[in-house]
Amino acid sequence: MKRLIVLLGVAGVSLSAVFVRWSTAPSLILALYRMAFSAALMAVPVLAGRRRELKSLTRRDVLLCLASGLFLGIHFAAYFGALRATSIASAVVLVDTEVFFVAAASALFLGQRLPRRTWPAVLLAFAGSAVVALADSAAGTNALLGDLIALAGAAAMAVYTMIGTVCRQRLSTSVYTFLVYTSAAATLLAAALLSGTPLAGYGPVNGLTALGMDCLLYTS
């Protein structure tokens, strides 16, 4: 059963990248749709069954969730943008370097260090990421820029993960996820409005693409 769950999770992440490349909407709008649909899907169970927990939230809880959502929104905007600028393989590999940023931040700010036996795997993964970036640098400036955007997305995801570690000590998964997804959607909406990117007019296919990514996420 665990293997099936892992397989579904990998399939969901992999196919979502393909959906982004397939879509014709701007990457910022696709990320906004993605987060808005996710927040809407989480709203029903949370508002129906977690009202007491929502009322008990402290100001600190809310601010941390808002900050976490801010960085999640940045992550998706960067990740989806990278998928348009570089190859799917490069974008996915470089975004997954999030673990390097988390390990570094944990050591610097939390005093947590990786066990020695895990360092060879980390260094091997880092070397692989460097090879990907070097290969893309030969492919042109656009691909290299996409790699840098993917790394920015990885850094944002790391901050989201670190803040989430703190939040999850007090909040249930459903409430935390709902608040973070809502914050991420609001962040992306603000970015779209400030950049003058139209919010609609991209056809139903792009909306279904974002909804399809959500379905893949929740089934995995």
Q: Where do the model's predicted regions map?
A:
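Hydrophobic transmembrane alpha-helices of multi-pass small-molecule transport proteins
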Residues: M42, L66, A105, L114-D136, ...
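Conserved small/polar residues in nucleotide/adenosyl-binding loops
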Residues: Y218-T219
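A helix-boundary/kink motif common to multi-pass secondary transporters
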Residues: P26, S87, S172-T173
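Glycine-/small-residue-enriched transmembrane alpha-helix faces in small-molecule transporters
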Residues: M1-L32, S38, L70, I74, ...
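Loop-to-transmembrane alpha-helix entry segments
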Residues: L63, V92-V95, G111-V131, G140-D147, ...
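Specific alpha-helical transmembrane segments that line the substrate/conduction pathway
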Residues: I29, M35-A40, F80-R113, G153
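Juxtamembrane helix-start motifs in multi-pass secondary transporters
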Residues: L30, Y176-T177
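Hydrophobic transmembrane alpha-helices of multi-pass small-molecule transporters
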Residues: A39-V46, V99-A107, S129, T161, ...
